[in-house]
Swiss-Prot record:
The gene is chlF. One of its GO terms (cellular component) is photosystem II. GO terms for biological process: light-dependent chlorophyll biosynthetic process; photosynthetic electron transport in photosystem II. The keyword Thylakoid applies. This is Light-dependent chlorophyll f synthase. The record marks 212 as: Stabilizes free radical intermediate.
């Protein structure tokens, strides 16, 4: 009996000894799974002060990288050979520019459309001389804003909302992609992209007009109508709402009427009908809207459609497809040109193009080769 009991005890001890590593492995796996589940729940939680989301996991490092490199480049980047002819252009503040004239100079024309990360250059100095920071900033920035737009869709999905906010943000995304990516691709080099700065933006606009006469494009004109018309409509809507506020019963007439609104209240905060009647008498009855839903849809759709049109105009101009533009009127039977105010724009465009021409001097070979030419 003693031997059997000892054998039993010994057997039980050995089984416990072999089961300990397995239990430890299972506990470690459970901890790893729990950590991953906690991370997933934190990423997709709508209780956070700022929603992260899975697209936010992609957006945050890209935006931080673009912002960090932009700040360093606009402060201390060395001159860049943008035209690829050995004439560097300084754009940083430490190179003598101020906050208005400073810009991140586009990647050199010698690079073209090639992918140019740091490890493709022979040295950091060569990478900086060829404008590598511009490509790094632009690519990370575009990935970041596209991820931000998808993050808006993700948050709307989590909250059970419709995806119209994400759809509206496609307008600035389309404009950024058109100017920073599609236009340089159409022109064959990233050096044709917009410099990242205040004066660089205006220089890009003037040069774009000189090369493509974008002011005569109907798509650009639709963009102007959408942006300025949307701003006018938003100002009208805000002023009408402020003018027709309904005073709350909890506030006396001596208090400001602006204190009468609380987030989530059931009763309306302004008189929609009074605002529409005002528009009837001010402009025209057809200008008014039957309900606030159609009004707010119009306020969102007008500028978004306008920016889409302007971005499409830039995309078409990128590949030099200018057949949609308005050209100078001409009497075909007599061959006579009808002069209009558009001629002034054409003259200005020609002047800008002449001022921006690069002067490349070709010297004779006998001067560049160092040979002595006998005097005759």
């Amino acid at each position: 009996m003693k031997l059997e009991s000892d054998h039993v005890i010994a057997t039980s001890d050995s089984s416990d000894y072999t089961s300990e590593p397995t239990a430890n492995k299972l506990s470690k796996r459970r901890k790893k799974v729990n950590y991953w589940e906690k991370f997933c729940s934190w990423v997709t939680s709508t209780e956070n002060r700022l929603y992260v989301g899975w697209f936010g996991v992609l957006m945050i490092p890209c935006v931080l990288t673009a912002a960090t490199v932009f700040i360093i480049a606009i402060i201390a980047a060395p001159p860049v050979d943008m035209d690829g002819i050995g004439v560097p252009i300084s754009g940083s503040i430490l190179s003598g520019n101020n906050i208005i004239t400073a810009a991140v100079v586009p990647t050199s024309a010698a690079i073209g459309l090639h992918f140019y990360p740091i490890w493709e250059a022979a040295s950091i100095d060569e990478w900086l001389y060829n404008g590598g920071p511009y490509q790094l900033i632009v690519l990370h920035f575009l990935i970041g804003i596209i991820a931000y737009q998808d993050r808006e869709w993700e948050l709307s999905y989590r909250l059970g909302m419709r995806p119209w906010i994400s759809l509206a943000f496609t307008a600035p995304v389309a404009a950024s992609v058109s100017v920073l990516l599609i236009y340089p691709v159409g022109q064959g080099s990233l050096s044709a992209g917009m410099p990242l700065g205040i004066s660089g933006t205006f220089h890009f606009m003037l040069q774009f007009q000189a090369d493509h006469n974008i002011l005569m494009s109907p798509l650009h004109q639709l963009g102007v109508i959408g942006v300025l018309g949307g701003a006018f409509a938003a100002a009208m809507h805000g002023s009408l709402v402020t003018s027709t506020l309904i005073r709350s019963h909890n506030h006396s007439e001596s208090e400001s009427i602006n204190k009468g609104y609380k987030l989530g209240q059931q009763h309306p905060t302004y008189n929609f009908r009074s605002a529409q009647v005002y528009l009837w008498h001010l402009i025209w009855q057809r200008v008014s809207f039957p309900n606030s839903r159609k009004l707010h849809f119009f306020l969102a759709a007008l500028p978004v459609a306008g920016i889409w049109s302007a971005a499409l105009g830039v995309d078409i101009a990128a590949f030099d497809f200018d057949y949609l533009q308005f050209h100078q009127p001409e009497l075909k039977s007599q061959g006579q040109i009808i002069h209009t105010w558009a001629d002034t724009i054409d003259w200005a465009s020609l002047g800008i193009k002449v001022l921006d021409e690069r002067h490349i001097y070709d010297f004779p070979e006998n001067l560049t080769a160092g040979e002595v030419v006998p005097w005759k």
